Amino acid sequence: MIVVDTNIIAYLFLTSDHSTQAEQALIKDPIWCAPLLWRSEFRNVLALYIRKNILSLADAHQLTNEATLLMQGREYDVASHQVLSLVAKSTCSAYDCEFVALARDLGLPLVTTDGQIISQFPDYAIPLEKYIG
């Protein structure tokens, strides 16, 4: 089991330069988890695609359903004090620190492409490219 940030989930469901790597990560470990925040962030990505006419509303609904099914049962609330503690030690956003806090709490790696998270939390975060080998 691994913690993934919203970018990794988005790469899996939306065509990008990292889509193949996200698929390889899923093959390596199909049990992904994330803070509940991933849902709102994913909807925000889909909103951008809808507004740029890259995705239809129906397609966005379908992708939301597929992503939710993938993450079902492995979405977690993260305690505010844990998030704020990490915020105080870094320049990462509280959003990013939710993913780090979950990884720390579960004792799992956080797979991400976010350079800021990787550089500020090397004990918890691992680059997607490194994770898939």
Segments (PLM) and residue ranges:
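Entry/capping segment at the start of metal-dependent catalytic domains
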Residues: F42
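Short, well-structured N-terminal submotif of metal-dependent ribonuclease cores
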Residues: M1-L37, Y49-A58
